[in-house]
């Protein structure tokens, strides 16, 4: 009889997965550590909706917004008064990354996606807490989320767009 609860627990852990909400909003700190151990921190707010739409609003060291709908990436640098727009074919697909994630230890998951290993941590309420990986330049990237709020339904499309004055320079890539 003692074996049954252990088998149930083992099967639950074996098939545990991270549930992605329809939308989320949070504050974050993105910490980038280069190969010489130099660290730069970028705090801000993030919004996610519709499996592919992101809006990252950075407040330091420069005020910047990064928005994507999965096919176009828009970067607004308010200090430079410049907007860069790129069509992307291979963007960050958080839904696919989380679907590939397997439980590594309590509240820690690991996912291999497009030759990058992601370490994903969830909090005690099963909400996304952090994502860490090494980028193409061997920088360690860690994003820690705070005040994570999950929601149902998609956020309004207008809320997910980067806003900028028409006077900003536009660069298309």
Each predicted region: which residue ranges?
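A short, Trp-centered hydrophobic/proline-enriched beta-strand micro-motif
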Residues: 19-37, 47
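An acidic-aromatic
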Residues: 45-93
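A mature extracytoplasmic/lumenal domain signature
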Residues: 30, 58-62, 70-72, 79, ...
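Non-transmembrane domains of secretory- and envelope-associated proteins
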Residues: 39, 106, 112-116, 123-173
């Amino acid at each position: 009889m003692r074996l049954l609860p252990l088998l149930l627990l083992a099967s639950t852990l074996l098939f545990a997965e991270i549930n992605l909400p329809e939308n989320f909003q949070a504050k974050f700190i993105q910490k980038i550590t280069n190969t010489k151990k130099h660290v730069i921190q970028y705090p801000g707010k993030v919004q996610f909706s519709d499996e592919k739409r992101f809006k990252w609003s950075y407040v330091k060291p420069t005020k910047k917004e990064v928005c994507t709908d999965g096919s176009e990436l828009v970067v607004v640098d308010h200090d430079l008064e410049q907007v860069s727009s790129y069509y992307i074919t291979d963007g960050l697909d958080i839904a696919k990354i989380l679907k590939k994630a397997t439980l590594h230890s309590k509240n820690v998951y690991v996912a291999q996606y497009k030759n990058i290993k992601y370490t994903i941590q969830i909090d005690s309420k099963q909400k996304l807490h952090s994502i860490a990986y090494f980028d193409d330049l061997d920088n360690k990237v860690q994003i820690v989320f705070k005040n994570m709020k999950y929601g149902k339904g998609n956020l309004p499309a207008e809320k997910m767009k980067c806003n900028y004055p028409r006077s900003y320079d536009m660069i298309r890539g």
